[in-house]
Amino acid sequence: MNIRPLHDRVIIKRQESESKSAGGIVLTGSAAGKSTRGTVLAVGNGRILDNGSVKSLDVKVGDVVIFNEGYGAKTEKMDHEEVLILTESDILAIVEE
């Protein structure tokens, strides 16, 4: 199945979170938590402004981002993997290495 996001929505594949604490203790289950980093898989055409023009998104496919998994985030299955669909405003930063 292929999912194409609309407008200012972005599809993100969550990165695996580190399963060790700062002290080196291995965390399991819910103690490990969910990562708020992910890779952008697809982006919509852009946000529609009040004047009707379309502002393209700042993120692009392949970007690694830090996001806020807020109430608007939607979890879906795509090619047997869990992905998140959220708006660009839920993305807090682009990770540059």
Swiss-Prot record:
GO biological process, one term: chaperone cofactor-dependent protein refolding
GO CC terms, sorted: cytoplasm
Signal peptide from the UniProt entry: none
Matching Pfam families: Cpn10
Function: Together with the chaperonin GroEL, plays an essential role in assisting protein folding. The GroEL-GroES system forms a nano-cage that allows encapsulation of the non-native substrate proteins and provides a physical environment optimized to promote and accelerate protein folding. GroES binds to the apical surface of the GroEL ring, thereby capping the opening of the GroEL channel.
Species in which this protein is naturally found: Buchnera aphidicola subsp. Tetraneura caerulescens
Family label: Belongs to the GroES chaperonin family.
Keyword Cytoplasm annotated: yes
Subunit description: Heptamer of 7 subunits arranged in a ring. Interacts with the chaperonin GroEL.
Gene from which this protein is expressed: groES
Designated name of the protein: Co-chaperonin GroES
Protein's cellular compartments: Cytoplasm
Keywords, sorted A to Z: Chaperone, Cytoplasm
Top-rank taxon, per record: Bacteria
GO molecular function, one term: unfolded protein binding
